[in-house]
């Protein structure tokens, strides 16, 4: 098996890796490959082998998912930080429990406070401002594991 990985500078200045496989395709684990943001080209060429729930959580798969909306797992997509536009267009399919933990969904959550799962939001590192405005709804156990919540925890230490 020959695996070649090239580094690509992503638009957001994050390093992304594009995976080129020269391998017997019967040896590929399509479940895990469907989760790999660097494998989108290979997955696009082998749509029949995609694990759609796994792909729905793949941040690199938004274009492919947009072309196959009928195959999306909406629970998994609701946790995908790059899927906010797709979720907004399919508002009635959002899983709000999963979305509450999604760091990319803060604006959507702020606009729909009545739908928030406060335990999952308490774990969301991007939700500190929203949590600060709703201290009475915080799940303090979950917040304790939130790496962005140290200031909020210390300010509310009993």
Q: Where do the language-model regions lie?
A:
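Compositionally biased low-complexity segments, especially N-terminal hydrophobic helices
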Residues: 2-7
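Alpha-helical scaffold segments
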Residues: 8-158
């Amino acid at each position: 098996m020959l695996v070649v990985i090239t580094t690509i500078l992503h638009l957001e200045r994050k390093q992304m890796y594009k995976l080129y496989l020269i391998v017997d395709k019967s040896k590929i684990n399509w479940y895990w490959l469907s989760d790999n943001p660097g494998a989108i080209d290979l997955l696009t060429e082998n749509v029949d082998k995609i694990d759609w729930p796994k792909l729905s959580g793949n941040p690199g798969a938004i274009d492919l998912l947009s072309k196959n909306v009928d195959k999306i797992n909406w629970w998994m997509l609701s946790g995908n930080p790059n899927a906010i536009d797709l979720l907004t267009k399919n508002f009635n399919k959002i899983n709000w429990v999963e979305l509450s933990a999604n760091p990319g969904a803060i604006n959507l959550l702020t606009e729909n406070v009545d739908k928030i799962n406060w335990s999952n939001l308490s774990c969301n590192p991007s939700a500190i401002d929203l949590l600060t405005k709703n201290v009475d709804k915080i799940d303090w156990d979950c917040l304790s594991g939130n790496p962005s919540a140290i200031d909020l925890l210390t300010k509310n230490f009993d």
